[in-house]
Amino acid sequence: MKSTFALVFGILMVIAHLSFADEKVLCFDNSEETLNKEIKLFEQCGVTKDNANEENFNEAYICVLEKMEVLDENNQIVIEKFKETEKTEIVNKEEELMAAVDECAENKPTAEPKEFIQCYDEKVDKLCPDDKDIFEEDMEE
């Protein structure tokens, strides 16, 4: 009886592990509302599903930051404002992502947008690879 229970329990654990292995772990809210809001901002800044590439995405990202009111009068990213905005969409790995923000900003209160975006984007890709896949799939639709 014990061995039957152990066998059934073991099989259930393997099934549970396999079913969770395929699930994507997202760092950011990927609700339709949030994705549509982000896509709309990028479209307002000139990036659409038809012309999206890494170069114009980075340029548009600066425009998006301006629309989100996280740039100062010198067009530098105000890190605390950026963090506040970012935290509203983070669902996992907040501590790691905020550490990435600080690292990319070199622990300064403001940062130059292009360098910061490139650094932060690379760190997000490493920390949250499934998020990039979701956003790219949504841009393609």
From Swiss-Prot:
Gene3D superfamilies: Pheromone/general odorant binding protein domain
Location of the protein in the cell: Secreted
Modified how: Contains 3 disulfide bonds.
Record keyword Transmembrane helix present: no
Signal peptide (from-to): 1-21
Alphabetical keyword list: Disulfide bond, Secreted, Signal, Toxin
UniProt-listed SUPFAM superfamilies: Insect pheromone/odorant-binding proteins
Tissue specificity statement from the Swiss-Prot or TrEMBL entry: Expressed by the venom gland.
GO cellular component: extracellular region
Molecular-function annotations in GO: odorant binding; toxin activity
Sequence similarity: Belongs to the scoloptoxin-17 family.
Protein's recorded name: U-scoloptoxin(17)-Er3a
